[in-house]
């Protein structure tokens, strides 16, 4: 048996290792043996709310030393704070500088000047001019960054309905005029080339802007255009060629090109470390071949962009935020994390061996469970590594912690389900399951008297009478039927039942309880006084169930085993074909009774259901009868009897058929009652599940705890749905983002 378990664990572990090897396989993009023409360097803006930590001069100097190892030039976007020291510090490393100055929108939508923004822009502008004049290594000046791109996104172009021609909106026009004013002033003030940086589409749409710069600086970023990584380089140069045709003879600088290593997909554009290395290397080689001037964005990852609601934005660096290279420019590219598959295999193997060592698994059962356990192990490792791959803001930390915690019970529930299904479908044939071909003990003479209790609350009389008629046809010598109508004062409900019992004979007793407390259990307890004192077995059937004539004849003999207190037959339904909803509900019920109950029965841990249930009278009396402090008195009684050492048996053979809820609302109400009842049982009997308790076997505890966890998961699912709704405004207003992919492996395992 252990050989089967270890073999399955080994095979599943090898499959996991192979999967990790495929996912983390080394890529071999083309080598780039030269130096990068230019790299962007940007720090957290100090004047923006929630930002503001300026790097030290020593930190900037260290960054420039790293850039100098692989690049000839550095591009900066502002002269704010310590960034203003970059040109001077870069001279030590013989780095040229593309000097940028940042311009905020200084007018509102109506064109009114925002004085604070204007003053800040003027200060930035004049400071940049001074730096450009005083530093020999400043090669060019960038006045503003993507000003018109932002303006056109905020205020879309106006389309002429007749000609289809487009023109700038009045609001965007105001921003263009302000930008042109700064450009003209800069060109008059310094002798070095002046430009501004925009997306290629802005240069194509606004030739007026191109006329006011010494050279074109275009941002060609295929990722944001939703272009596949394989086509990124070709797309960038295609747009470059478009601008060459529009501006013949004018120098064109690809001011930004790059690819993120992490983040959400943008349709076909997929960020990951291997694709980043591939895209950047291919571009560098082609740019060198063509003699194109370019700048790669970024030198370093920018974690502060997570506070701006950007998912891929922080991950464009050649170096990560710890200043470690994410890939080299030559040689294979691989994420070297051998501890991830090792951790996943250890988790998967431990779960497999620990869980199956108490069973008698077949190879099919063992391998299916081992594969699921290894999938969970891989998922746990993927989720655990998330903080190492992503820069987490407060919202990401909150959601990652919550997601990781919730992933653990999901994993447990998933493994329990896989164990249940694979053991029943692929495991050994059940030993304890009662079946027609299993020889039952001989029925003694006289046969035990069975008292069948049929409680009803405002049930339709015709349906109730059909149930009683089916019992009248039972092929069993000694039984009685108690037709219990409780809390139903309307005569049209109970009077027909009373009359029908008289017609069916002395075996049928009508018990009318107009006012009862204590839920269904209260009615059943009050009806006990009407039960025949000689009754040896109590059977309970819902008022909508029509029973098979052999029900008692086939199952009562098993009570000859003096240790047996419960015999349970499955619930089934005679109207499952009527609607699609009922077909789905019936299939869901059947899955539990044909799989879950069969497996639980092997460990003497079935759930007692309040229909098609038979209980030994003496055990019932010793247990104290039906408990009135829960709405699921049947399940609670079953748990008490098992805790007292009694045995329960189950048969998969159908002996009764009821009716399904007619509407989804009725189905939901039923499930709410079951879930609420389960919580009542947990509150009452949780101490029996503690390791120190000896009232239940470990296997019984396992089944009850995992069974209850399904109800917990449903409740948590509702809570998470509510949390998702609450989280939406936090994402929008507070920019608290949500980690996604790393937590989905256990979810996918659960679905599959």
Walk through the language-model features, giving the residues of each:
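Aromatic-rich peripheral "rim/lid" segments of glycoside hydrolase catalytic domains that contact
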Residues: 32, 46, 52, 265-276, ...
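Long helical/loop segments within the catalytic core of UDP-sugar-dependent glycosyltransferases
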Residues: 499-536, 549-631, 636, 642-643, ...
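N-terminal membrane-anchoring/stem segments of glycan-assembly enzymes
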Residues: 349-444, 703-727, 731-738
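Short, acidic, metal-binding catalytic loop of nucleotide-sugar glycosyltransferases
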Residues: 468-478
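Substrate-binding cleft of extracellular glycoside hydrolase catalytic domains
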Residues: 85-192
């Amino acid at each position: 048996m252990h050989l089967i378990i270890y073999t399955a664990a080994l095979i599943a572990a090898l499959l996991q290792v192979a999967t990790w090897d495929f996912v983390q396989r080394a890529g071999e993009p083309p080598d780039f043996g030269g130096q990068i023409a230019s790299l962007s360097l940007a720090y957290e803006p100090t004047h923006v709310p929630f930002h503001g930590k300026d790097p030290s001069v020593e930190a900037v100097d260290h960054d420039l030393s790293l850039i100098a190892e692989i690049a000839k030039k550095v591009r900066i976007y502002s002269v704010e704070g310590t960034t203003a020291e970059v040109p001077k510090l870069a001279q030590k490393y013989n780095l040229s500088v593309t000097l940028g100055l940042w311009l905020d929108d200084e007018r509102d939508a109506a064109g009114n000047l925002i004085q604070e923004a204007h003053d800040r822009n003027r200060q930035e502008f004049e400071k940049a001019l001074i730096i450009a004049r005083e530093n020999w290594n400043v090669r060019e000046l960038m006045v503003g960054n993507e000003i018109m791109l932002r303006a056109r996104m905020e205020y879309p172009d106006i389309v002429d309905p007749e000609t289809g021609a487009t023109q700038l909106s009045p609001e965007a026009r105001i921003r263009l005029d302000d930008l042109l004013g700064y450009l003209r002033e800069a060109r008059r003030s310094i002798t070095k080339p002046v430009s501004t940086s925009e997306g290629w589409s802005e240069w194509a749409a606004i030739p007026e802007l191109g006329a006011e710069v010494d050279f074109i600086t275009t941002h060609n970023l295929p990722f944001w255009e939703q272009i596949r990584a394989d086509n990124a380089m070709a797309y960038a140069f295609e747009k470059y060629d478009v601008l060459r045709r529009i501006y013949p003879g004018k120098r064109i600088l690809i001011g930004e090109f790059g690819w993120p290593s992490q983040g959400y997909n943008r349709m076909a554009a997929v960020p990951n470390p291997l694709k980043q290395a591939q895209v950047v290397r291919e571009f560098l080689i082609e740019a060198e071949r063509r003699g194109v001037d370019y700048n790669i964005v970024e030198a370093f990852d920018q974690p502060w962009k997570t506070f701006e609601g950007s998912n891929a934005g922080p991950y464009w660096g050649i170096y990560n935020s710890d200043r470690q290279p994410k890939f080299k420019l030559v040689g294979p590219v691989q994420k070297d994390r051998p501890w991830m598959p090792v951790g996943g295999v250890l988790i998967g193997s431990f779960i497999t061996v620990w869980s199956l060592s108490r069973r008698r698994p077949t190879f099919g059962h063992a391998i299916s469970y081992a594969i699921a356990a290894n999938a969970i192990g891989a998922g746990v490792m993927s989720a655990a590594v998330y903080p190492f791959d992503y820069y987490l803001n407060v919202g990401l930390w909150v959601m990652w912690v919550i997601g990781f915690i919730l992933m653990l019970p999901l994993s447990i529930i998933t493994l329990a389900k896989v164990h249940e299904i694979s053991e029943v479908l692929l495991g050994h044939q059940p030993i304890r399951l009662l079946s027609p071909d299993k020889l039952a003990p001989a029925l003694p003479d006289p046969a035990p008297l069975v008292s069948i209790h049929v409680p009803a609350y405002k049930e339709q009389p015709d349906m109730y009478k059909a149930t009683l008629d089916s019992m009248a046809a039972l092929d069993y010598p000694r039984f009685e039927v108690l037709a219990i109508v409780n809390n139903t004062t309307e005569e049209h409900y109970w009077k027909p039942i009373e009359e029908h019992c008289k017609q069916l004979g002395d075996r049928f007793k009508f018990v009318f309880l107009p006012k009862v407390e204590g839920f269904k259990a209260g009615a059943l307890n009050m009806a006990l006084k009407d039960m025949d004192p000689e009754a040896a077995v109590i059977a309970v059937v819902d008022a909508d169930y029509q029973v098979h004539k052999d029900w008692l004849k086939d199952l009562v003999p098993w009570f000859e085993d003096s240790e047996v207190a419960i015999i349970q037959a499955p619930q089934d339904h005679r109207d499952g074909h009527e609607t699609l909803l009922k077909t789905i509900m019936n299939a869901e019920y059947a899955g539990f009774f044909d799989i879950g109950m069969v497996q639980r029965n092997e460990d003497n841990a079935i759930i007692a259901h309040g229909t098609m249930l038979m209980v030994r009278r003496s055990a019932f009396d010793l247990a104290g009868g039906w408990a009135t402090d829960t709405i699921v008195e049947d399940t609670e009684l079953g748990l008490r009897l098992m805790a007292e050492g009694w045995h329960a048996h189950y048969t998969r053979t159908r002996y009764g058929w009821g009716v399904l809820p007619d509407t989804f609302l009725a189905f939901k109400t039923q499930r709410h009652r079951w879930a609420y009842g389960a919580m009542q049982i947990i509150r009452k009997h949780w101490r029996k599940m503690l390791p120190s308790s000896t009232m239940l076997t470990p296997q019984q505890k396992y089944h009850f705890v995992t069974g209850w966890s399904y109800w917990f998961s449903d409740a948590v699912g509702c809570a998470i749905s509510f949390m998702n709704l609450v989280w939406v405004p936090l994402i929008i207003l507070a920019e608290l983002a949500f980690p996604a992919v790393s937590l989905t492996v256990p979810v996918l395992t659960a679905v599959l």
